[in-house]
Amino acid sequence: LNGRLQAYAQNTHHWNTDHGKVYLTAGMRLNWWSFTNEVLPSPRMSVVWMPGWKRDFTFRVATGIYYQAPFYKELRQTLQDENGVYRIHLNNQLKAQRSYQLVLGSDYYFRAWGRPFKFTAEAYGKWIDRMESYTVDNVRVRYSGMNDSEGYAIGLDMKIMGELVPGADSCISYSAMRSRMRFLDDKHNLGWI
């Protein structure tokens, strides 16, 4: 028998200041899975500021801790016994991958060619621990079945949304990202890859 419990709570407060409107949203997601018996608290918070000097701009910052519970293929751990025989074991000690995230963003609302547009830009950083490494053999992906690595991702996303062609919503976007990982037991001295 396998079961999961999940709960989520969120609240938003807003107020007016001399410098504009401020929205504060805080929440908590809580997950539990009987297979791993792991309790995963995920707090998150965001602050949005709409400055009084220019209503066309919105600035925001968001942060939180996020978990990704393992899928079945990730739980599979290949073990070799003393006779050289391989067997598959489902690792119930495998922890959910965890990321600490920070996002800074801004929106700008404007008109061009008589139509409304929105420009959005976000910069983000994510630190990920308890990662599970994998190998790729052609189209086959084999997971290690262990929390044996850590990593990070940083990036920038920019997007213009609106009616570039009259009557049709469309967007132009640009994204740049750098992500790296390293093994916790770096016996081959690979470093960040």
Which positions does each model-derived feature cover?
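Repeated loop/turn-to-beta-strand initiation elements of outer-membrane beta-barrel proteins
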Residues: T17-L24, K54-F59, A112-F119, G167-S170
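Gram-negative outer-membrane beta-barrel transporters
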Residues: H14-H19, Y124-W127, S144-I193
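Membrane-embedded beta-barrel scaffold of Gram-negative outer-membrane proteins
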Residues: Q93-I154
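Outer-membrane beta-barrel translocator/channel fold
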Residues: G52-L102, Y108-Y109
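Residues that define the transmembrane beta-barrel architecture of outer-membrane proteins
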Residues: G3-L5, V39-P41, R98-L102, E150-I154, ...
